[in-house]
Amino acid sequence: MAKVQILNMVVLDNPCPFHNPFQFEITFECIEDLPDDLEWKIIYVGSAESEEYDQTLDSVLVGPVPAGRHMFVFQADAPNCSLIPESDAVGVTVVLITCTYRGQEFIRVGYYVNNEYSDPELRENPPLKAHFGQLQRNILASNPRVTRFHINWECTSEAKMEDIENVDPASNTMLPPNCAPSKGLAAALNTLPENSMDCM
């Protein structure tokens, strides 16, 4: 059973201009004391075509975390416009909030994001080169996609290294085809659909 549960996530300052920081108010609960840090990340999916355009906007270490309920506001600067392909600047993309413990991701919350011009004239006749200063960002806050991953909460780095060293190199060297990485926004939100749910 997961030792950390996200109880609520609120998207703040939404909708807003594209260059405004992302802000999420996160409430989570630990069922017991965690001796190590939780690492939270905000990741902006720059293009559905390739993960190379993903931008980690910020990461923060929280911990050690005592048992109980906790709340914090996680803020990150807007993505670097120069790293977003022109063809993906306007339209729908995804922002991800992930959390890991001892290097293992155990939860991922994804939101669809719609970037569009606030000026009706620009919406009707968009310029060839995106004008990020004219874009408005609207996060679909009412429908997050939550994916949970099973991890070893007790694992130490030494034990993990032993496990890696004791693996038979001939076995499990390649992922089966159904585990191969896939591209697209749906892939970013649906890593393990059987372990996910549509809302918190």
UniProtKB/Swiss-Prot annotation:
SUPFAM superfamilies to which the protein is assigned, alphabetical: ASF1-like
Alphabetized UniProt keyword annotations: Chaperone, Chromatin regulator, Nucleus, Transcription, Transcription regulation
InterPro entries reported in the protein's UniProt record: ASF1-like, ASF1-like_sf
GO CC terms in record: chromatin; nucleus
Function recorded in the entry: Histone chaperone that facilitates histone deposition and histone exchange and removal during nucleosome assembly and disassembly.
Subunit details: Interacts with histone H3 (including both histone H3.1 and H3.3) and histone H4.
Protein name, entry field: Histone chaperone asf1a-B
Gene: asf1ab
